Amino acid sequence: MSNISLYCLPYSGGSAAMFYKWRSVLSDNITLRPLEPAGRGTRIRQPLCLTMVDAVAALYHPFVKHYTGGDYAIFGHSLGGIMAFELVHYILDHGHDMPCALFFSGCRPPDRASHEVILHTLPDQAFMEEIVKLGGTPVDVFRNKELMTIFTPIIKNDYRLYEQYVFQAKARTLTCPIVLFHGDADNLVMQDELLAWEKFTTRKTRTIIFPAADHFFVDKHFEQVVGYVNQTIESLEIVG
């Protein structure tokens, strides 16, 4: 089997660093390439993007910097899943090949992104209290005042991206398999919503459920998540 690049996108407030531990578990033929959203981590000096369109364009630049052709897959968790969906269409619009697989984790289908509750306009303290209740951001961030000072603007902006996101129908249907990861104790994404992902690809959609797992199963059960990524890529009909 040929080598495959795996591009990964983090959840709200997250950075590319959350994926570094994956390297010890990924198969040898998979090269990990975490994508850093602007305004955090290795791109902390860059301004935050205020729209999903700008955020995706900013993610394309590090993608194309490393992509030299060949097989690739994309993984995104939560907000990162919506970004991954938009990014793959942006990549295709710029003349690159279809990915060999897409992994959407803890993520509603793009046409079902929820705008029922708007949080990013709340004062900081009220905002933080609400997202802790929702389970939409790791609680550890809010136990450290220094981290809060750094990450609150980032997290609020990520919520802005999601809450102002409006799905636009695409010119194409994807032709790669989609794998969905879901924690059955996730109170942000309901399992029955995941069926709507099927219409976005002509290929098979597989759903993997993590029992008694909340929205952050991607951290707590990362070895299992990576195991399924390895298994999926191993099963693809790719000739080296």
Language-model features: locations:
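Flexible "cap/lid" loop of the alpha/beta hydrolase fold
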Residues: 89-127, 163
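Short beta-strand/loop motif that positions the catalytic acidic residue
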Residues: 180-182
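Acidic catalytic loop of the alpha/beta-hydrolase fold
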Residues: 185-189, 215-216
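Gly/Ala-rich beta-loop-alpha elbow adjacent to hydrolase catalytic centers
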Residues: 76-80, 84
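Active-site catalytic motif of lipid deacylating hydrolases and related acyltransferases
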Residues: 2-72, 110, 116-128, 210, ...
